[in-house]
Amino acid sequence: PSNAKELIDKKLEERNIIYKNLFVYDENTVIKTKYFNIEFFRTTHSIPDSHGVVIHTPDGTIVMTGDFKFDMTPIGPMSNLHKMAKIGEKGVSVLMSDSTNALVPGVSLSESVVDENLGEIFSSCKDSRIILATFASNVYRIKHIMETCKKNKRKVALFGRSMENMVDVALKCGYFKDKDIVITAEEANHMKPNEVCLLCTGSQGEPLAALSRIASGTHRQITLMPDDVVIFSSSPIPGNGASVSKTINKLYKKGVKVFTNAMSEIHSSGHANQEELKLMIRLFKPRYFVPYHGEFRMLKTHADLGVMCGVNKNNTFVLENGDVLNLRKGVVTPGGKVQAGEVYVDGSRIGEVGSAVIKDRILMSNNGILVIIANIDTENKVLLGTPAVTTRGYILVNENEDLIRDIQSISQGIINKCLKSKYFNYNDMKSEIINGLIPFLSDKTGRVPIILPIVMDVKTKKEN
């Protein structure tokens, strides 16, 4: 869709990448290849122009829903249930369906209800400045907020790079018609509180996002006032609850009024609840069912919903990343496993950097590195001099002479002990140095850097 293309073009432009092989599709597009054809069906989600994908192959038809919900009163276009049903009537071998809300019973809240509730808050807070945080990708929500602001004679100031980019793209694509409603931060600061709405990122409590900085009092352009109203038109993504609570607590300490989805229905998930998931299965009537996009418990629950809707239990597959299924002549069978997971890009190398290297880099960036250099004479099994110690990003050597001497002493003792061993080898010596220093450094400094022992064999000349 045009919205996605504009966002990709903007990302490429930021990185000075020229790429012209981007093509815009719509619901009527059919992509034909040598071995299979691809078509699309419109779905409803929190992002605009979302579509599911249908892949027609000689061995059967595969449907992938993408993220979706069924909203009978959406702000944007409705899902094309008629096309889904037609595809289902022709026969679907495999349905792969979004499992994000598979644990949630019932039907997801309509975006129109959110629309009404946000409108009521705006009406009840006519004299206050409104600061509203939501997902930048939720274009139809932002469209409604702008329309509500226009009804209430408010201008909208944008805060947060992703919010600014998304609104810019949405204006280009025609989702928003009224460009004059958007003003700059400087203009907002010169307007009365009841004449402006600050639309910002940070609904998930991200430390560097606009709302978090406003709550902390570190935002360069916005200072909270006691009569301000802050609206979280969102719900915490799993794992972000603590960050969101921290931001909300900071706002309460500033004395502002806060609205959250827990208090009012001012956010709707973009993912289908159980009854909507059942409807998707009923529309496509697949022979095989593969729930995806969710934790294992969500996938398992979704698979059980498939069985409830008529799919043979033996024809449901709860997979982990990397699991392979083979589709041959309409029959699906397990096909082993492939390597799957993060692919790290390191300069010009792709996929060559393992997680251990990334872990070391994170550790170095947080705690620094400590290098111990020792010269030994393996032939005579003696340590030549005191080990040298240097650090980067951990401590300053000149300001911690006592600590450095202790490190040297511990290292020296470990090396001498290893040299006396009958089965001495370099790797064991290095491991002993590391294991000996970790508890000491943790106790003395509260941090443990990467410890890198370097042991060199120096040959000494014997006197005749």
Segments (PLM) and residue ranges:
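Anionic-ligand-binding alpha/beta catalytic cores of soluble enzymes and soluble regulatory domains
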Residues: 290-330
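Conserved bacterial/organellar gene-expression machines centered on ribosome-associated P-loop NTPases
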Residues: 357-450, 455-458
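A contiguous, basic/glycine-rich beta-loop/short-helix subdomain that forms a polymer-engagement track
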Residues: 159-234, 330-358
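His/Asp/Glu-rich metal-coordinating catalytic cores
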Residues: 1-191, 209-223, 242-246
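Proline-aspartate-enriched helix->loop->beta-strand connector
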Residues: 92, 127, 277-294, 449
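Short, surface-exposed connector motifs at secondary-structure boundaries
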Residues: 123-130, 150-154, 226-231, 259-261, ...
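Generic long, charged, amphipathic alpha-helical segments
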Residues: 251-272, 276
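A general structural motif
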Residues: 108-114, 179, 200-216, 239-243, ...
